[in-house]
């Protein structure tokens, strides 16, 4: 674990579902912020004990950049009782339109965070692009309707899930993960308002921390 700035931490852990055919590194990144009152865990996996201990006397919460980045969220909710901010998972209709599968194959939609949204485990706080979370986080649209890029004003940090990722060629918007009919330029356009913000940290969950100049290169 490394403290990037006062109240801002980064660590990595091996993703349990990783396969050698994946374009991303097995070790993925998670982040935490602590302003003395509120502790936020972003896409948490393998949370260090030092961070977990802070949850006892903080208003703690988990923030997912995408529902499929739930990682250790359920385990943390069951042990710490923290709420989870998350975008909604893919609907059955979206899966059929996007991947050309049948209604039977699509079922009830993506099973991401089903434990949270349908099984009553934990408190879900659903958000979407354009929302300002009461946790002090603003959500910007990513490469899919439920894959967000987050602005944390108190730490002057941008946290990205799959939209801005390091896949061997530097941090970038990866064409491989774009939805049907979505172009790289469209994604970049939706994120350019970030260039007007005082960004000091660009925090990728696939690729780790980067300098703010990288964001300008990617979005210009």
Please identify what each model-predicted range represents:
Residues 2, 6-9, 13-16, 38-41, ...:
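Metallo-beta-lactamase
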Residues 16-61:
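Pre-active-site segment of Zn-dependent metallo-hydrolases
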Residues 25-27, 121, 127, 144:
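Residues that act as N-cap/strand-start positions at coil-to-secondary-structure junctions
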Residues 27, 70-71, 188:
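Residue-level marker for well-ordered alpha-helical positions
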Residues 29, 80, 146:
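Residues that flank catalytic or metal-binding motifs in active/ligand-binding sites
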Residues 36, 58, 79, 197-198:
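Structured helix-beta-strand junction loops
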Residues 46-129:
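Active-site HxH/HxHxD metal-binding segment of metal-dependent hydrolases
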């Amino acid at each position: 674990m490394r403290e990037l700035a006062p109240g801002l931490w980064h660590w990595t852990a091996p993703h349990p579902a990783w396969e050698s055919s994946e374009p991303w590194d097995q070790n993925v990144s998670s982040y935490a912020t602590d302003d003395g009152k509120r502790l936020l865990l972003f896409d948490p996996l393998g949370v260090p004990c030092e961070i977990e201990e802070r949850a006892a006397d903080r208003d703690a919460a988990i923030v997912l950049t995408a529902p499929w980045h739930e990682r250790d969220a359920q385990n943390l909710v069951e042990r710490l009782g923290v709420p989870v901010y998350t975008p909604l998972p893919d609907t059955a209709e979206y899966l059929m339109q996007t991947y050309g599968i049948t209604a039977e194959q699509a079922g009830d939609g993506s099973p991401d965070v089903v434990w949270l949204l349908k099984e009553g485990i934990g408190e879900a706080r659903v958000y979407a692009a354009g929302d300002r979370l009461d946790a002090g986080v603003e959500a910007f649209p990513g490469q899919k309707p439920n894959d967000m890029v987050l602005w944390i004003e108190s730490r002057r940090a941008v946290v990205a899930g799959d939209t801005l990722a390091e896949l061997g060629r530097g941090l970038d918007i990866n064409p491989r993960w774009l939805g049907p009919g979505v172009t790289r330029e469209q994604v970049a356009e939706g994120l350019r308002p970030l260039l007007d913000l005082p960004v000091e940290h660009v925090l990728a969950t696939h690729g780790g921390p980067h300098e703010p100049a990288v964001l300008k290169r990617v979005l210009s």
